[in-house]
């Protein structure tokens, strides 16, 4: 009994949660305490039905766990019962997330917490409310404002952030002049850059899939993009990845992070990202009179009606005609 008292006093000095200290004083262990930490671990286990899914959900939850630890502290995250997590705790996490990510990103991240807690409530037959339900998030759902197009002036200013590295420059110019997704460019093979036809061939590779079937397409290249791609592909095998450092699982994410790090040295507005170059291409095509069907073919959206109507060879010329107005 004396030993338990001494241990209890020692733990109390370490500022452990009172319920843990009380268990030590009593000499009796209570039923397993369900905490935010165990909720997250159980959720990862529940969602990890394949190795790929396990890796993705683990990375997502780990980032979220770090945010929660920053707000709640390690002790609260690991030892405080889920029953003692309050609505104010949920609001505190929401406010922290909104200080560093967009409203819609915060919604997605808080959705993981809410779903994980719902899973724990069902699996452990807990009779408690989910305090992360129906959190008010100002600005959520305003998807049209989440990612704004970059202006021509901003694009010119951005050139300085990429021009000192041939890889970064080739990626930037291709994204700027094609409107392709970052993953589509990052996952190219050398042979996908057809300098004779002056186009990119966007197709699946061993290290990168495509978002949709309609993403499989050919896209005209600007003279500046051709020059940048020739420089970066020099001496490489046609079957080899054009950007070997990104020819791996989640390579597109790594590429995007590198490009975003450079972009943020010039532009700090969170609504402007590398994807804003894609929005810019879409807007400029529309503003120069490009028909919607041709714009969709260039960007890999919808059904590729251009190829069906004109034939694939002529479709490339049709797309180039409209893209040249954007490049001018």
Where are these regions (language model features)?
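N-terminal helical hairpins
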Residues: 1-37, 45-53, 58-60
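DNA breakage-rejoining catalytic core of tyrosine-based enzymes
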Residues: 83-84, 126-129, 139-158, 209-223, ...
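Conserved tyrosine-mediated DNA breakage-rejoining catalytic core shared by Y-recombinases
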Residues: 187-231
